[in-house]
Amino acid sequence: MLRAWQAECASQAIEKFTSNKHSHFFCQATPGAGKTVMAAEVASRLFERGMIDLVLCFSPSLTVAEGMQKTFSWKLECSFNGGLGSLGGSYTYQSIRFLDENFWNTVSKYRVLVVFDEIHHCSFDDEGRSNSWGLEIVNKIQDFARYTLALSGTPWRSDRLPIVMAEYSDPDGKVVCDYQYGLQQAVEDKVCRRPKIVLIDNEHLSVKAGSDNQHFASIIDCLKQSDVSYQSVIHNEDAMNFILNSGCQKLAQIRQESPSAGGLVVASSIKHAKDIQKRLVEHFNQSACIVTYHHDNPLHEIESFRQSKVQWIVSVGMISEGTDIPRLQVCCHMSSVKTELYFRQVLGRILRINDSPNQEAWLYTFAEESLIGFAERIEQDIPDSCMYIKQENNVPSAIDEKRLPSSTVSESVQPNRSQPSLLSWGETSDMINSNNAGFTLAFDELRLGQFKQRVIAAFI
């Protein structure tokens, strides 16, 4: 049975498509609301009306593509693997360039609905500021598709380039959506969980660099006024232990009511993820698995966790958007990626409602300046800071998706410090060589005292 918003959105899409005036529909619905089911409903109605012959779905990762294949196959009651007898197929954006001329010649003979999931991954404009995925869509798909349906939970780009096929208002540069379903409405409709974000800070930080000692009352002050980087925070033993302990305690509380509830840790690197998994198992006595883009079969790892009662899954770039694991209810955000888009997509992983008695959703992260801002703006569906900026000069996109795993495209790289050193937080910490964490630092020692937490509860 469709949710109310899914039925309403599907009806509006069909109405627009049948008007014979417009063939593109843009839906913005909060992460976790069920956009794929809505898209499959649109396809089903178009088939019933005899308006299409095939459906092609494109998404940013294999994980999402597999999920779309299952949903469309279920909704259309047929195979959806692109083979003989199927009504379509599900592919990644990266695969578009590898589909040969015979494929495009064949599908161009039919009336096709093309569904673009997480369309914000694809940028294009006439000024040359396009990425490879956006160019592929314009050059190979836009002209032959009878209808196009674009989906996004976060319809903006961190580089503030225009999304392919999207319309923008002037002069504020806000994306124009045919249908919007925000997080507040989703919470009120009990479609999504009400998020609570915990910002972890420290009141007594000290940094030793040579003979100099600096003292700070917050993480923000320390990062702004010293050579300490955010990488130092997320790799520090005391900091990691504190955030993981907080997450483990909350997950234990939730599992008293909902025994299958799980937690997600978003790490900054494979080495970081392995360290976190080891801590969860050995220090906190938790069951934990790990999934990264270096795994031979990450989809199997994710599916195995989805069906199990393992407490934690530690991920590097694999469970950030579009991955449907409703039993996730706690998240420890320890990634070095600090963009609003990534933050919201990660938060969306713990917001999907299921039939468990407890429906709490908790995200733990550190009180870094940008992360604080993201948390405080969580009630805005499209933050003002994420508007498309029109530039006079041609600026090519700095990212080429073909060189990176699709799930890590948004990741930024922190600049290395020039001097190796020893790093320590807290009076009882052992000194650790910062080179072992994959980066270098320009200070000798970092100590901190009492941790504190600030909870932001949205939509109260």
Say what each PLM segment does.
Residues 20-42:
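Walker A/P-loop
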Residues 30-32, 120-122, 139-164, 190:
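Conserved helicase ATPase motor motifs in RecA-like P-loop NTPase domains
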Residues 69-107:
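Inter-Walker segment of RecA-like/P-loop motor cores
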Residues 105-150:
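SF2 helicase catalytic motif II
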Residues 160-260:
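Interdomain helical connector at the RecA1-RecA2 junction of SF1/SF2 helicase-like NTPases
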Residues 234-235, 239-242, 250, 372-460:
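Long, largely alpha-helical accessory region at the distal end of helicase-like NTP-driven motors
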Residues 287-390:
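Conserved RecA-like P-loop NTPase helicase motor core
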